[in-house]
């Protein structure tokens, strides 16, 4: 027997019949339809909104709203992209001091991190506290070197 569209049937157990509530007690979901006796949750419409505690002051309003939580052990960096390093000449050493002298970083408050945005056209010796993977790859591809400095 060949299967055609009019003879196709779904697998047994793959489809479940919808419960028809309120159609007599023999159906199993008649009378109160599985909602119990009386009360707000047996009425029509959504019973209560999420987080409702029956009129009691809810938890999200009892807990104080504290502001200005600082991240513990947050690492801040003075960042610079590779495209800015093209201002240097070949075989120059790039570090936080040389970037301040060139005017590329104004206030060296934090350790230096090199980001990989842009293209590097010069061969440089870069000394920084952190590099992104892309930045390190691009510096080495340009013939330069990356030196990690420990910030203590």
Swiss-Prot record:
Keywords assigned by UniProt, alphabetized: Ribonucleoprotein, Ribosomal protein, RNA-binding, rRNA-binding
Annotated Gene Ontology cellular component terms: cytosolic large ribosomal subunit
Bias type Gly residues, positions: 25-37
Domain of life: Bacteria
Region called Disordered, residue ranges: 1-57
Residue ranges, compositional bias (Basic residues): 14-23
Keyword rRNA-binding belongs to the record: yes
Pfam families listed in its UniProt record: Ribosomal_L27A (PF00828)
Gene Ontology process terms (BP): translation
GO molecular function: rRNA binding; structural constituent of ribosome
Protein family: Belongs to the universal ribosomal protein uL15 family.
Protein role: Binds to the 23S rRNA.
Oligomer status and interactors: Part of the 50S ribosomal subunit.
Protein name (record): Large ribosomal subunit protein uL15
Lineage, opening ranks: Bacteria, Bacillati, Cyanobacteriota, Cyanophyceae, Synechococcales
